[in-house]
């Protein structure tokens, strides 16, 4: 039985309000927005924020999460104060718009023997966690090309309730990492999960970590959903279409797939 509502991550290069209407028509229960462009905390006025909240309520859509745009890893102190300040503004915006979850790609956890980068990364994420806690939100670190156990160990070491993990099967598969194993390894740290794989990815995918029986980039959906069930994840499954594809086709295809597991 599929216990997860489906969400849709919207494309920041397209008009947001049109996409919200489209998401509702498709049957999505929530959306993920990116804090960039017209939705940047520095550009979205108080009136704009009220109108956006009203539109989401009218369309009966939840704001699953707000995505924090990041251009580089947090393993360097270069312009760190400015980056943390911008993140803090996004945390405040997320809370005001009605979600307590912010997603961000912060880069790989540096190895412990790289002391300088590891210390910079640890201090930066700790600072972000403190800011998130102050704003009443959680910061979910998006999985990428590192094993789930490595991220879990790092999160365990910080032990901050304002930090979490977001499972991105497509990114993991492109890196040759099994999303099923990563989900189980991260366990209760998982606060958000995507529904998608890396088949047809423009960037290509590594050999499938589940063996020769699975094409490159393909996700073992039944095992993935089972792993999320095992760790007690009850949140949204967010569909994140590639900008080059029709989001309606992507969402509908996955919605039909999940019905077969119902």
Locate predicted features:
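Short, solvent-exposed loop/turn segments at secondary-structure boundaries
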Residues: 42-46, 75-81, 113-117, 177-178, ...
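Histidine-acidic metal/acid-base catalytic patches
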Residues: 1-5, 13-29, 148-163, 167, ...
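Soluble or luminal CAZymes and related metallo-dependent hydrolases
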Residues: 15, 44, 48, 82-86, ...
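Active-site-proximal loop/turn and secondary-structure-junction residues that shape catalytic pockets
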Residues: 10-14, 35-37, 69-72, 106-110, ...
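Short beta-strand segments at enzyme active-site cores
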Residues: 32-33, 63-68, 99-106, 139-143, ...
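N-terminal pre-domain/capping segments
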Residues: 1-91, 95, 99, 257-262
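A short acidic, helix-capping loop that chelates divalent metal ions and anchors anionic groups
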Residues: 37-40, 72-77, 110-114, 174-176, ...
């Amino acid at each position: 039985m599929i216990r997860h509502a489906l969400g849709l991550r919207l494309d920041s290069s397209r008009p947001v309000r049109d996409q919200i209407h489209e998401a509702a028509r498709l049957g999505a229960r929530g959306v993920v927005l990116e804090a960039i462009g017209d939705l940047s905390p520095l550009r979205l006025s108080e009136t704009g924020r009220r109108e956006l909240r009203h539109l989401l309520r009218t369309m009966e859509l939840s704001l699953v999460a707000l995505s924090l745009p990041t251009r580089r890893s947090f393993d360097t102190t270069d312009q760190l104060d400015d980056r943390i300040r911008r993140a803090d503004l996004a945390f405040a915006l997320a809370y005001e718009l009605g979600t307590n979850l912010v997603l961000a790609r912060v880069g790989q956890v540096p190895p412990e023997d790289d002391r300088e980068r590891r210390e910079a990364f640890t201090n930066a994420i700790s600072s972000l966690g403190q800011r998130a806690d102050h704003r009443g939100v959680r910061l979910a670190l998006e999985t990428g090309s590192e094993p789930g156990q490595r991220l879990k160990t790092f999160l365990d070491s910080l032990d901050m309730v304002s930090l979490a993990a977001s499972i991105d099967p497509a990114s993991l598969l492109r890196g040759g990492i099994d999303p099923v194993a990563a989900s189980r390894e991260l366990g209760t740290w998982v606060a958000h999960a995507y529904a998608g794989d890396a088949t047809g990815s423009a960037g290509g995918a590594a050999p499938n970590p589940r063996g020769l029986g699975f094409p490159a980039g393909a996700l073992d959906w039944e095992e993935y959903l089972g792993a999320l069930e095992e760790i007690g994840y009850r949140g949204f499954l967010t569909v994140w279409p590639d900008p080059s594809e029709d989001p309606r086709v992507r969402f509908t295809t996955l919605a039909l797939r999940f019905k077969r597991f119902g």
